[in-house]
């Protein structure tokens, strides 16, 4: 019993819920925890949409989100979005926990600046699996599925199923 309790304390969401329920006598949702961290404690406070409190978003002015994408960011923890060159995400795209979206690399001659390049474009209704990495300049068509842990380094057309490091298309979805 003690070991299980200690394991739960290692996960911040569960730890916050246990503390609030046990000592304050209230139950709390993930949405409320995100609100407290983002709006009151100002972690990712400059972002207009809700983000999970364990995620980090940089360059918020360069992000364009489609319809319902913010819900996935609010529920998927541990995500990292660096949008130096811009990130455009289509409607109803879903992200797993730990997804990394990196839109710019450092200039090799000056490590304090980013290389200018095209934005990352992710189509509508895509699924991005847990711990997947999407690198600068990538374009994913609509209805793509990126497997867990895949590293996407190049463009893929619509309805591609991507896996591996570097990601490769293993098949097309059948609608």
Regions found by a protein language model. Give the residues of each.
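Domain-scale signature associated with acetyltransferase and cell-envelope carbohydrate enzymes
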Residues: 1-103, 108, 124, 175
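Glycine-rich hexapeptide-repeat left-handed beta-helix
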Residues: 97, 102-118, 124, 130-175
């Amino acid at each position: 019993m003690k070991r299980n309790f200690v394991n739960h304390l290692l996960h911040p969401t569960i730890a916050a819920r246990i503390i609030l329920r046990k000592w304050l006598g209230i139950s709390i949702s993930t949405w409320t925890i995100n609100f407290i961290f983002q709006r009151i404690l100002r972690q990712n406070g400059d972002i207009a949409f809700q983000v999970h409190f364990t995620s980090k978003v940089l360059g918020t002015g360069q992000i364009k989100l489609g319809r319902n994408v913010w819900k996935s960011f609010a529920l998927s923890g541990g995500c990292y979005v660096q949008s130096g060159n811009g990130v455009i995400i289509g409607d109803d795209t879903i992200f797993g926990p730990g997804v990394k979206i990196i839109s710019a690399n450092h200039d090799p001659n000056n490590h304090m600046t980013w290389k200018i390049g095209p934005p990352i474009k992710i189509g509508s209704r895509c699924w991005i699996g847990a711990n997947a990495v999407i690198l600068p300049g990538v374009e994913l068509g609509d209805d793509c599925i990126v497997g867990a842990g895949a590293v996407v380094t190049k463009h893929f057309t619509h309805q591609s199923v991507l896996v591996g490091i570097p990601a490769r298309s293993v098949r097309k979805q059948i609608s």
